[in-house]
From Swiss-Prot:
Participates in the expression of late viral mRNAs. Expressed before viral DNA replication, UL95 assembles at the viral pre-replication complexes (pre-RCs) containing the early viral protein UL44. Pfam families: Herpes_UL95. Residues 1-36, 167-216 are annotated as: Disordered. The gene is UL95. One of its GO terms (cellular component) is host cell nucleus. InterPro entries: Herpes_UL95 (IPR004280). This is Protein UL95. The lineage of its organism: Viruses, Duplodnaviria, Heunggongvirae, Peploviricota, Herviviricetes. It comes from the Viruses. Residues 202-211 have a biased composition (Basic residues).
Length: 527
């Protein structure tokens, strides 16, 4: 209310000043046509310039015609009379267009003394009056300032028209094939009456708008109600959600000739296999750290220390295969790194998704884990270097790949990371996910690629014949390693189609023999 009162007072003051100035300047010559132009158009009104040097807001026709009517004009005085410029197709949009071409021309003239002060005042007044007109048309809307190529600016509001669509009410006459003989007679009688009155179309529109009072008693309505009752009786109630185990339960059994449940295929390529089995992921992590700290990529709840988070994900003590019989222990003397989704082995496209999944895996893998206290030797070395016991760095030897005495911790660090940083990251991740229901089932497995393929082979050969009710497993498919695929597959016959292979069986021994490890910790797959 106060803002509206201030605007009205300002308009009245400008009117009084304008009357005085126009009375003194009646004999002066009018400015050029492109001096100052203000135009406002909307779905319910249009702004034009009248002969009395005022900005007139008048209502237009409902059909969007450009010709303004003479009903209830609202006048706003302006400094100079000129012809309003209407942009084509502007009906339905509230706009305010103020030309600044004349302003630019006058400011570029030399000498500067020729530039009249009244010209600048008139331009400023035109801009103010355009704002007042827009606020008068739509006082509660926000404006968007758009600069046009011809050095104009456009104030736009009410871009979306506010029209209420009228939904016709269907009566018994529009029920289609369910209408009986009585309904047909009623329709014929209504049509004849409408034609006699010369307003058949108007009678139809009135019938659509007016719902019949006895709609529930018509035979067609009763028949439709019976059909809906039969559909409702045949529907089965939804099962109660008692346990959230995030498992797929869309099949009853696993057989060769029945239904086989499987998740989406996990597609990997040769490059993904090499990076997933390699203990040295320095180049990949450095590429991630190069862009991850760009403002706007991450949210406020993400972990701040991304380097420590990636250390825990790629080379922390819980980032390796948890099987006691891992193939990596026989091949290299230490287990292979745990298998992650494919996006962790590719250039990052969505940093938000990447970081959220990384935090989820770290939370699940390190649940209940605490880093051991530093040894006295490490404490002495840390204090001698100027750091305390909590600031000592995790071991970073080039010959990493060594299993400790406990048998479940492997240290393959990327770069030296202090224990304090790791503890802070774990605390931040636990604070984010603790006490919340998170899909921990997909991330709970700490299995390398070769052990996962071995389990997939066992599933195909052993578990398929046991009539298992549910198999929640996503088959792994290596796309460009066809030489390692055997002829043994679990398949079933689809009706009218050929045999479809669902779970491919891979030759794990051939894949293991094709791996070669260099001194830098990189693995190459020679297939």
């Amino acid at each position: 209310m106060m803002a509206a009162a201030v605007v009205r007072a300002e308009v009245r003051r400008q009117r009084r000043e304008e009357r005085k100035k126009m009375a003194a300047a009646r004999t002066t010559e009018d400015p050029p046509e492109n001096h100052v132009v203000a135009d406002v158009a909307c779905g319910t009104g249009a702004v034009t310039r009248s002969s009395s040097s005022s900005l007139v807001v008048s209502s237009s026709s409902a059909s969007g015609s450009d010709e303004p009517s003479s009903a209830s004009p609202l006048s706003f005085p302006v400094c100079s009379p000129s012809t309003a410029v209407r942009s084509p197709g502007s009906a339905g949009v509230s706009t305010s267009l103020c030309s600044v071409e004349r302003m630019v021309e006058l400011s570029a003239q030399s000498p500067a003394a020729d530039f009249s002060v009244s010209e600048a005042w008139r331009f400023e007044e035109a801009v103010n009056m355009a704002l007042v007109a827009c606020e008068a048309v739509s006082p509660y809307d926000r404006f968007r300032l758009i600069e046009t190529p011809d050095e104009n600016f456009l104030l736009v509001t009410n871009v979306i028209p506010r029209e209420s669509a009228e939904v016709p009410v269907l009566d018994s006459s529009s029920s289609g094939g369910d209408s009986g003989p009585e309904d047909k007679k009623k329709n014929v009688g209504n049509k004849t009456a409408g034609e006699k009155n010369g307003g058949g179309s108007r009678a139809k529109r009135r019938r659509r708008r007016r719902a019949p009072k006895n709609d529930a008693a018509t035979p067609s309505f009763l028949r439709r109600h019976d059909v809906l009752e039969r559909f409702a009786a045949a529907a089965e109630p939804l099962p109660s959600l008692c346990v959230r185990d995030y498992a797929l339960r869309n099949a009853d059994r696993v057989t060769y000739d029945g239904e086989l449940i499987y998740g989406s295929y996990l597609l990997y390529r040769k490059a993904h296999v090499e990076l997933s089995l390699s203990s040295n992921k320095v180049q990949h992590v450095e590429a991630v750290l190069r862009q991850v700290y760009t403002p706007g990529l991450l949210d406020h709840h993400n972990v701040c220390d991304v380097e420590a988070l990636l250390w825990l994900l790629y080379c922390g003590p819980r980032s390796f295969c948890a099987r006691d019989t891992c193939f990596g222990r026989e091949k290299n003397g230490c287990p292979f790194p745990a298998l992650l989704p494919k996006l962790f082995y590719e250039p990052v496209r969505d940093y938000m998704t990447y970081m959220n999944l990384a935090e989820l895996y770290v939370f699940v893998w390190y649940r209940g884990y605490e880093f051991p206290a530093p040894t006295p030797q490490a404490t002495t070395a840390g204090s001698g270097g100027g750091g305390g016991a909590g600031a000592c760095a995790v071991e970073t030897s080039a010959s990493a790949g060594r299993v400790d005495d406990a048998g479940d911790e492997v240290h393959l660090p990327l770069k030296p990371v202090s224990l304090d940083r790791l503890r802070e990251v774990l605390q931040a991740v636990r604070g984010r996910f603790s006490g919340r229901e998170v899909p921990a089932w997909p991330a709970s497995s700490r299995t390398c690629l070769l052990c996962a393929l071995y389990s997939q082979n066992r599933l195909c050969l052993d578990l398929a014949r046991d009539e298992a009710r549910t198999v929640s497993y996503s088959p792994i498919v290596i796309q460009d390693c066809a030489a390692a695929v055997t002829d043994v597959t679990l398949s079933h016959i689809l009706p009218g189609q050929s045999t479809v292979s669902l779970f491919p069986v891979y030759h794990v021994g051939k894949l293991l023999d094709a791996l070669s490890l260099n001194d830098a910790g990189l693995i190459t797959l020679n297939l």
